[in-house]
């Protein structure tokens, strides 16, 4: 166990050094101080100090959390730049790939070192959800930009399909980390609507956005990639909001999109009715799926 801990500490330290160098490059290119880069750099400096202590005494969970928070801030700065520039066609593909790689590193690190059979114990559900959300949301924004480029779609719809499948996979993964709260006499809630949301696996506004984003990506896949040969891209297609369902199957854009958007509309017009979440786009997509099926 001590050897495994020491290995993780060394690897986190190496990754932290690489990230710090990357932040330095970003800061120099930006020509001004940025809140997110400053915060990311501070987290990595703290990480460096902790890694300098006795490695056997280091808490890998704390180190990994610091590294993950730094990566989330660093990549957020770069994502904002991509969005502001509307994902430049000549460089965005490589940049998106690079950001996905950064955001995947914490999970990869834990899995490679087999620190715990349930690696979420090291990162925690909220950080795992955030990593999946950020990857899925990044691909959603990128695909949204690509769907407006008619010539690009004619040439590279197969590439769009790959981005969509990956993005949907990350968003469904995010929705499936936590199990819904089972309603019973031993659990008390302040109001019935909150109870309904938690029992549906809706723990935050981000969970709702993830449902809408994945449903919209399924729509793009069905609209722009329908003529392509199906791929054996297996995804956990359950949308219960829980990690309890672990079966995987090839993703069917229409089927998954219908399932998740029906739940989205039900939640928005049910327990969240007073908050006036917009369901117009979701209903239009469901209507598209209905006519496409018939």
Curated annotation (Swiss-Prot):
Role this protein plays: Plays an important role in the removal of damaged mitochondria via mitophagy by controlling the stability and localization of RAB7A. Required for the recruitment of RAB7A and ATG9A vesicles to damaged mitochondria and promotes the stability of RAB7A by inhibiting its proteasomal degradation during mitophagy.
Keyword Acetylation assigned: yes
Family: Belongs to the RIMOC1 family.
Pfam families the record matches: RIMC1
Keywords: Acetylation, Autophagy, Cytoplasm
Chain segments annotated as transmembrane: none
Quaternary structure annotation from Swiss-Prot or TrEMBL: Interacts with the MON1A-CCZ1B complex. Interacts with GDP-bound RAB7A and promotes its interaction with the MON1A-CCZ1B complex.
GO cellular component: cytosol; nucleoplasm
Subcellular location: Cytoplasm, Cytosol
Predominant location: cytoplasm
Protein name, UniProt field: RAB7A-interacting MON1-CCZ1 complex subunit 1
Modified residues (N-acetylalanine): 2
GO BP annotations, alphabetical order: mitophagy
């Amino acid at each position: 166990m001590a050897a495994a801990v020491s290995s993780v500490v060394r690897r986190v330290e190496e990754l932290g050094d690489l990230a710090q160098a990357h932040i330095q490059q970003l800061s120099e290119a930006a020509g001004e101080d940025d809140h997110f880069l400053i915060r990311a750099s501070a987290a990595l400096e703290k990480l460096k100090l902790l890694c300098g202590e006795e490695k056997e005494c280091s808490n890998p969970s704390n180190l990994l959390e610091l590294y993950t928070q730094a990566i989330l801030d660093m990549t957020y700065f770069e994502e904002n730049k991509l969005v502001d520039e509307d994902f430049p066609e000549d460089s965005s593909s490589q940049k998106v790939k690079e950001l996905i790689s950064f955001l995947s590193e914490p999970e990869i690190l834990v899995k490679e070192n087999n620190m715990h059979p349930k690696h979420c114990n090291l990162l925690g559900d909220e950080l795992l959800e955030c990593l999946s959300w950020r990857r899925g949301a990044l691909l959603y924004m990128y695909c949204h930009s690509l769907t407006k480029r008619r010539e690009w779609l004619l040439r590279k719809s197969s590439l769009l399909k790959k981005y969509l499948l990956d993005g949907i996979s990350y968003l469904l993964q995010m929705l499936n980390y936590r199990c819904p709260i089972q309603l019973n006499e031993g659990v008390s809630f302040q109001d019935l609507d909150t109870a309904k949301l938690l029992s549906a696996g809706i723990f935050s506004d981000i969970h709702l956005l993830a449902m809408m984003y994945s449903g919209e990506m399924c729509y793009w896949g069905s609209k722009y990639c329908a003529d392509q040969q199906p791929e054996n891209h297996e995804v956990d297609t359950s949308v219960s909001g829980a990690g309890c369902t672990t079966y995987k199957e090839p993703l069917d854009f229409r089927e998954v999109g219908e399932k998740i958007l029906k739940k989205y509309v039900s939640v928005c017009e049910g327990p969240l009715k007073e908050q006036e979440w917009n369901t117009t786009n979701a209903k239009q997509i469901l209507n598209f799926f209905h006519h496409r099926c018939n």
